[in-house]
Structure formats: C-alpha cells, structure tokens
C-alpha cells in the first residue's frame, strides 16, 4: 500500500470529517487556515462559527471596520492574523473583484498568506495541487522518511510527495 493510501485510509477512519470549514469555498478555507495557525481545532471552531456569522463572505469582511474585526477575533490571540485577514479581504475585493486567486504566486503575494495557507486554499478550494506543510504534516512525514524535522531537509524530502 502506498504512503498516500495509508494516510487517506487513516484519515477516513480517524480523521475529522465534519469541520465547518471543510468546503470548496476559498473564503472559508482561508479564514480557517489563518485561525488554525498556532491554535487548536477545538479552540477555533466556536470562533470560526461566530466570525462567519459576522463576516459571511470576503465583501462583508472587507467593508467591516478593523475594530469590529478585532472584536470578533478577541480571545484567539495573535491579532496580526486578524489585521492581515482584513487587509487581504480588501485587496481581494478591490483588486480581484471578490474572487480568490487560484494560483500560488498571487496567493502568497497577499498579506498573511504563506506557503502552507496557499497550498491549503489551492488543494481544498480549487482542487489543484498544493502542499500543506503544517506542523502535523511535518511530524508525520519526518517520521515516515526518518528525516530530522529540519525545515530545509524536510522540504527537499517532501517534494516527491507534493
């Protein structure tokens, strides 16, 4: 059995399959990926649901007052993430006419979107090839390949899988 088949089989048996952001909506994927940075899933779920009630789409987020965005973010910490969300929502609204870019280069050029977040948006929202290299993925791949969790060594080792 291939490595990818083993991972998919494990995920089907033990993974989280009913999270509110598991959708092909790039806005929902993006917001969840930003919230999940340095924050556990169980903590994020109620914040995500409340945030979506206040800002159900990129336009409402872009038109919101920053203080309102920060108020909705209160309790999650790392407030720079909320500021970047707000700034990026404005860019997507103004420069991309509320349509998320569907290519890596445009995504990583946006404030607060790095390699892993761009990979998640591409893979989950657009069904395109994208590498999601968060802490959990790094841990699993480094154990499977018996590679030190050294970022540059791990990136080289994971390339054939992405």
Residue ranges and their predicted role:
Residues 3-162:
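Catalytic cores of DNA base-excision repair glycosylases
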């Amino acid at each position: 059995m291939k490595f990818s088949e083993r991972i998919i089989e494990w995920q089907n048996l033990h993974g989280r399959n009913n999270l509110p952001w598991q959708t092909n909506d790039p806005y929902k994927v993006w917001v969840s990926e930003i919230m999940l940075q340095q924050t556990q899933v169980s903590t994020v779920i109620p914040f995500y649901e409340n945030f979506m009630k206040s800002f159900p789409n990129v336009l409402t987020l872009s038109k919101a007052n920053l203080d309102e965005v920060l108020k909705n973010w209160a309790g999650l910490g790392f407030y720079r993430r909320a500021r970047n969300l707000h700034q990026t929502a404005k860019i997507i609204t103004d420069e991309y006419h509320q349509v998320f870019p569907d290519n890596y280069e445009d995504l990583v050029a946006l404030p607060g979107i790095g390699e892993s977040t761009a990979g998640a948006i591409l893979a989950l929202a657009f069904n395109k090839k994208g590498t999601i290299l968060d802490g959990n993925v790094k841990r699993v791949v480094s154990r499977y390949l018996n590679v030190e969790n050294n970022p540059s060594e791990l990136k080289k080792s994971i390339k054939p899988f992405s």
